[in-house]
């Protein structure tokens, strides 16, 4: 062990100018004299023990030969840090106040060329930036110009993610100001391709990864996340990403994209958002054989092993972040999605966007479409192609709204809704073989195996596609819908675009321009007989950002179905006669933050009414309160 005197001598030598030059005046790149090397060896030993006092002497004190060899490497590399090995690590120091070079690489505080002259002097930025000082608006204009040069959507996505990693406020300012143009870039449909290629385009981790390797240590993994005041978590296990299937760990693009929209559209602070991927393996052989795959290379865990990890995760979230953190389940396979929602809805603040979010936005579209086609919700007949999470979730919310309006039992209201899965129409004769979540939708009817036969037999006024299978709304099907409906309501909801049941152009052309159409993925306006039809997009982004904000500002501890109905009814009221005349049953996204504030106010009001809110007293004007709580991405001035 070094004596206290020797340690002090070594520390003083480290601060001396002789540290950087030999006695003979040699430069710092040279090896220096023997005595200087000895001083450096002793100073290095002091630093090692200061950083890790419990290290054994054999690690702290290196042999002279080893040290001399490392000094040669350090001299060539240009610094003491190059002397580090696995046995003698360096400490990754971080400063409490970012300045200079560090500040420019901090995405939470970086402003690029928008740093003022005063800020450049105060934070040691002078010379690290070109002389020009520009506004945030000009930065937005420049980036939009650059993005429009890319012809491939994935290139735009990568450029946007790169911006988010460099300058967080500029990213959200860009997205908010150009939401209609950039929404398809940061989310569907482009995010689907990004997830498929996530391993290849992976640059920097975003979010938190919890894998089977972390079993028994999930609490510690969550503690590694730097933020503590988390309000919204979006979590996926990657088994059913959009309509693309099992993408394993590469499904992280979905939670990242969703939470970007929570901030941009709903105003939830970025630091309060946490994207998480639960990696339990993948059954996708292509990914397992892909050298760039970033997840566990094993078959997907199921049963007890899977549910034990999820139980540990849910318990850890509640322990660290409390019971008022909203946990949004995203893109879980049917068999897990329904089980997880049923299991945790009574003990946690949970929300499944594929089941509940999709249902809420589609119900809003249906309520809005009634202003075009006439009648009440109970007077229409509904046929779904697809009986998974989305299909059954929408069907249940329709039945709940009908029950609310008519005061009829929910079982009676379900009879207005028919579902068709891969084996045909869901009828009573199939009840024994049906999964539990499909059984409420089995009605008395003869077996029907094809969609066209079901349409001709049931004669629905509303046809909704949630199958994930493209081109299933054929010309014959849409012509049949148009033959007995003056204004057939056709929702082609599957994502991405390639999986859509039909395109907007097909729906309008095959119905002679009479269809009331909405889709899950965006479509361009369609001209038919001289009239421009603007297809509405039944995008969950209308609902979940405002819904989440409403939960946050009310301090709700549980999600109730009446809160979903309140969100639907509020969104339905936002579409105007001008929108209807253009053919759209949804309002434009240009006003989405105002819409989100109104939805948040409705959701919060319902939470207070149901006794689920904990943030007391209740604000007098919930809409104004919601707006005041929303994150704005304008630059802040620095001292």
Swiss-Prot record:
Keywords: Chloroplast, Metal-binding, NAD, NADP, Oxidoreductase, Plastid, Transit peptide. Residues 15-34 are annotated as: Disordered. Residues 1-49 form a transit peptide. NAD(+) binds at residues 240, 354, 495. Its cofactor is Mg(2+); Mn(2+). The keyword Zinc does not apply. InterPro entries: Aminoacid_DH-like_N_sf (IPR046346), Malic_enzyme_CS (IPR015884), Malic_N_dom (IPR012301), Malic_N_dom_sf (IPR037062), Malic_NAD-bd (IPR012302), Malic_OxRdtase (IPR001891), NAD(P)-bd_dom_sf (IPR036291). NADP(+) binds at residues 383-399. The keyword Metal-binding applies. One of its GO terms (molecular function) is NAD binding. It comes from the Eukaryota. SUPFAM superfamilies: Aminoacid dehydrogenase-like, N-terminal domain (SSF53223), NAD(P)-binding Rossmann-fold domains (SSF51735). The record marks 354 as: Important for activity. Divalent metal cations. Prefers magnesium or manganese. It is an enzyme of class 1 (oxidoreductase). It holds the Pfam family Malic_M. One of its GO terms (biological process) is malate metabolic process. Its EC number is 1.1.1.40. Pathway: Photosynthesis; C4 acid pathway. Homotetramer. This is NADP-dependent malic enzyme, chloroplastic. The lineage of its organism: Eukaryota, Viridiplantae, Streptophyta, Embryophyta, Tracheophyta. The gene is ME6.
């Amino acid at each position: 062990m070094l004596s206290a005197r020797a340690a002090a001598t070594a520390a003083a030598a480290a601060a001396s100018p002789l540290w950087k030059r030999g006695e003979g005046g040699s430069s710092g790149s040279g090896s220096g004299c023997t005595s200087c090397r000895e001083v450096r060896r002793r100073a290095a030993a002091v630093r090692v023990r200061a950083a890790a006092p419990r290290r054994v002497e054999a690690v702290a004190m290196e042999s002279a030969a080893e040290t001399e060899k490392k000094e040669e490497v350090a001299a060539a590399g240009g610094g003491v840090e190059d002397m580090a090995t696995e046995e003698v690590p360096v400490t990754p120091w971080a400063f409490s106040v970012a300045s200079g070079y560090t500040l420019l690489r901090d995405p939470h505080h970086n402003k690029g060329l928008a740093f003022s002259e005063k800020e450049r002097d105060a934070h040691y930025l002078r010379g690290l930036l070109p002389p020009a000082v520009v506004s945030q608006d000009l930065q937005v204009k420049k980036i939009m110009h650059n993005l429009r040069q890319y012809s491939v959507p994935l290139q735009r996505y990568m450029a946007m993610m790169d911006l988010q990693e460099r300058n967080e406020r500029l990213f959200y300012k860009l997205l908010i100001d150009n939401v209609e143009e950039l929404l398809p870039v940061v989310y569907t449909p482009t995010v689907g391709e990004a997830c498929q290629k996530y391993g290849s385009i992976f640059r920097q981790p975003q979010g938190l990864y919890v894998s089977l390797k972390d079993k028994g240590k999930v609490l510690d993994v969550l503690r590694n996340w730097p933020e503590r005041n988390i309000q919204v978590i979006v979590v996926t296990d990657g088994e059913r990403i959009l309509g693309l299937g099992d993408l394993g760990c590469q499904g992280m693009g979905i939670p990242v994209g969703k939470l970007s929209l929570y901030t941009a559209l709903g105003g939830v602070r970025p630091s309060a958002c946490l994207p998480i991927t639960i990696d339990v393996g993948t059954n996708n052989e292509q990914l397992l054989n892909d050298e760039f795959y970033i997840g566990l290379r094993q078959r997907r865990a199921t049963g007890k092993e899977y549910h034990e990890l999820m139980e540990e995760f849910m318990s850890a979230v509640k322990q660290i972040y409390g019971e008022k953190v909203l946990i949004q389940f995203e893109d879980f396979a049917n068999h897990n999605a329904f089980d997880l929602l049923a299991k945790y809805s009574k003990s946690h603040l949970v929300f499944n966007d594929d089941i509940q979010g999709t249902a809420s936005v589609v119900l809003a579209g249906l309520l809005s479409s009634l202003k075009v086609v006439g009648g009440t919700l109970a007077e229409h007949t509904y046929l779904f192609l697809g009986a998974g999470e989305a299909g059954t979730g929408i069907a249940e919310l329709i039945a709940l709204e009908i029950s609310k309006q008519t005061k009829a039992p929910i079982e009676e209201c379900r009879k207005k809704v028919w579902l068709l899965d891969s084996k045909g129409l869901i009828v009573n004769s199939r009840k024994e073989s049906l999964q539990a979540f499909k059984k409420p939708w089995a009605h008395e009817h003869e077996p029907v195996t094809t969609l066209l036969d079901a349409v001709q037999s049931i004669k629905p006024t509303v046809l909704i596609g949630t199958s994930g299978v493209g081109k299933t709304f054929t010309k014959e099907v849409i012509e049949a819908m148009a033959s007995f409906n003056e204004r057939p309501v056709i929702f082609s909801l599957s994502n991405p675009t390639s999986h859509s049941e039909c395109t907007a152009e097909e729906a309008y052309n095959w119905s002679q321009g009479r269809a009331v159409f909405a889709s899950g993925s965006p479509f361009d306006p369609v001209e038919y007989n001289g009239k421009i039809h603007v297809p509405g997009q039944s995008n969950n982004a209308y609902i979940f950002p405002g819904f989440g904000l409403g939960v946050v500002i009310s301090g709700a501890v549980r999600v109730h179905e009446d809160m979903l109905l309140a969100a639907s009814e509020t969104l339905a009221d936002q579409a105007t006669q001008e929108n209807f005349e253009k053919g759209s049953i949804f309002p434009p996204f240009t006003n989405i933050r105002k819409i989100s504030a109104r939805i948040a106010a409705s959701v919060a009001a319902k939470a207070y009414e149901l006794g689920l809110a904990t943030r007391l007293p209740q604000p007098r004007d919930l809409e104004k309160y919601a707006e005041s709580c929303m994150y704005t991405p304008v630059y802040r001035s620095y001292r």
